[in-house]
């Protein structure tokens, strides 16, 4: 356990940020799964709608620093490619 006041504060701050990041990542994963399920079922309408929701969540996560912007772009690109592959 830290003895220095600033170190104690950093521990609290890290715990708070870790919790926030987990919530955001969990939401993104859920939305990505919705897109993947819709693609697997070849449901173009649901996949497109789910893709929009997922893109918004991924971009927000990237702007908050949860994901690196290139990581977010890669996730969005792969999802869009999957949705566009539906005939």
From Swiss-Prot:
InterPro entries: Ribosomal_bS20, Ribosomal_bS20_sf
CC annotations in GO: small ribosomal subunit
One GO MF term: structural constituent of ribosome
Stored Pfam families: Ribosomal_S20p
Family, similarity comment: Belongs to the bacterial ribosomal protein bS20 family.
Function in brief: Binds directly to 16S ribosomal RNA.
Protein's name in the database: Small ribosomal subunit protein bS20
């Amino acid at each position: 356990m830290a003895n220095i006041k600033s170190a104690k504060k950093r521990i609290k701050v890290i715990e708070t940020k870790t919790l926030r990041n987990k919530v955001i990542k969990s939401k993104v994963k859920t939305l990505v799964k919705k897109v993947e399920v819709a693609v697997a079922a070849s449901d173009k309408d649901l996949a497109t709608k789910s893709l929009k929701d997922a893109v918004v969540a991924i971009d927000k996560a990237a702007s908050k620093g949860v994901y690196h912007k290139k990581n977010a772009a890669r996730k969005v690109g792969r999802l869009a490619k999957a949705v566009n592959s539906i005939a």
